[in-house]
């Protein structure tokens, strides 16, 4: 199978390496210098240092040529840009008249200005295109790059998209499950990043494992309430892309969002943390959107509110935790 992966960050690089073990795979990045480095060393020293990439993986700085690789009906295009870059990528595909038949995206979050989910952005930019959907689940790029076991879910209304994605990714140490609850998968992937900041704050304050468990459990309730209001199915939020991804992101040392929370608890400013991180922390980008959507649907999300207070409203992490603890008792 021919596969084009668009975006050579850590996640795009790791998945391109996995795909190249079985398929004719091209990895695209707009940075020609990065492509030159990748072609020379077969290692992404910027974003996934220390992980050797297969010699069969090819690299491309020309987007048109990369898209040509995925135009065949039997091919697959994997969009590995952040949410903030998704619309521009789709628009470029459309304007070039190089829209692949089957598209999956890896980003998690909501578009900041519109508060749209990724699939809604796709519907706006690629009207009439149906063989598409998110590939999501509990996964750290470094572990995937190292060939460690992982399970992901592809969600699409299109059976062809689901089948094509499973055929591409389901080999080696990677298991792919499939379903059609696109909304549930995308809500889970967005909200878990915000909740991971909360658990990072609690861990950074030394509040203990009991507090972490409470935040994860009550956070899952917030995720489920918002997801149901937006049209997701309840069972999705106890699956890989809901509870599974939440557990990993809220507890794993490789989690950028948890790291942000821990650093906030230590007293560092958000700007300093993000500058030092050097990578996207989607929980910071989409926290306001999650809270705004919750408020517009009259959904109570106190943990999300606390995270937004710390990130954007000048509330000290310990004061935000104290406010949560002062909330009135209520039935579970």
Curated annotation (Swiss-Prot):
Record family assignment: Belongs to the NAD-dependent glycerol-3-phosphate dehydrogenase family.
Binding-site residues for NADPH, renumbered to this chain: 11, 30, 108, 141, 256, 280, 282
Keyword annotations from UniProtKB, A to Z: Cytoplasm, Lipid biosynthesis, Lipid metabolism, NAD, NADP, Nucleotide-binding, Oxidoreductase, Phospholipid biosynthesis, Phospholipid metabolism
Active site: 192
Residue sites binding sn-glycerol 3-phosphate per the record: 108, 137, 139, 192, 245, 255-257
NCBIfam families: PRK00094.1-2, PRK00094.1-4
Lineage: superkingdom: Bacteria
Catalytic activity of the protein: sn-glycerol 3-phosphate + NAD(+) = dihydroxyacetone phosphate + NADH + H(+); sn-glycerol 3-phosphate + NADP(+) = dihydroxyacetone phosphate + NADPH + H(+)
Functional note: Catalyzes the reduction of the glycolytic intermediate dihydroxyacetone phosphate (DHAP) to sn-glycerol 3-phosphate (G3P), the key precursor for phospholipid synthesis.
GO molecular function: glycerol-3-phosphate dehydrogenase [NAD(P)+] activity; NAD binding
PROSITE patterns xref list: NAD_G3PDH
This protein's name: Glycerol-3-phosphate dehydrogenase [NAD(P)+]
GO CC term (a single one): cytosol
EC supergroup of this enzyme: oxidoreductase
């Amino acid at each position: 199978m021919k596969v084009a992966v668009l975006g050579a960050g850590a996640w795009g690089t790791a998945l391109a390496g996995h795909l190249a073990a079985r398929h004719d795979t091209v990895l695209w990045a707009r940075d020609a210098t990065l492509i030159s480095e990748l072609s020379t060393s077969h290692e992404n020293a910027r974003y996934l240092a220390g992980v050797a990439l297969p010699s069969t993986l090819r690299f491309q700085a020309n987007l048109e040529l990369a898209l040509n690789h995925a135009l065949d009906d039997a091919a697959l295009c994997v969009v590995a840009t952040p949410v903030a870059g998704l619309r521009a990528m789709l628009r470029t595909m459309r304007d070039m008249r190089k829209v692949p038949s089957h598209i999956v995206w890896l980003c998690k979050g909501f578009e900041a200005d519109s508060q749209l989910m990724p699939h809604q952005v796709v519907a706006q930019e690629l009207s009439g295109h149906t063989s598409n959907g998110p590939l999501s689940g509990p996964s750290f790029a470094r572990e995937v790059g190292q060939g460690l076991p992982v399970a992901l879910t592809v969600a699409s209304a299109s059976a062809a998209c689901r089948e094509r994605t499973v055929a591409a990714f389901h080999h080696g140490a990677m298991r792919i499950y499939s379903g059609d609850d696109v909304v549930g998968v995308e809500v889970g992937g967005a909200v878990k990043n915000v909740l991971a900041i909360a658990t990072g704050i609690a861990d950074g304050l030394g509040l203990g494992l009991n507090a972490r468990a409470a935040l994860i459990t009550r956070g899952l309730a917030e995720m489920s309430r918002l997801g149901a209001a937006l049209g997701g199915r309840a069972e999705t939020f106890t699956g890989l892309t809901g509870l599974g991804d939440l557990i990993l992101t809220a507890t794993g040392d490789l989690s950028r969002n948890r790291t942000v929370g821990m650093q906030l608890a230590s007293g560092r400013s958000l700007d300093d943390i993000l500058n030092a991180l050097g990578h996207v922390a989607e929980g910071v980008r989409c926290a306001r959107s999650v809270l705004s959507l919750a408020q517009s649907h009259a959904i109570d999300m106190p943990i999300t509110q606390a995270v937004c207070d710390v990130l954007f409203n000048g509330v000290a992490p310990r004061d935000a935790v104290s406010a949560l603890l002062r909330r009135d008792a209520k039935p579970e």
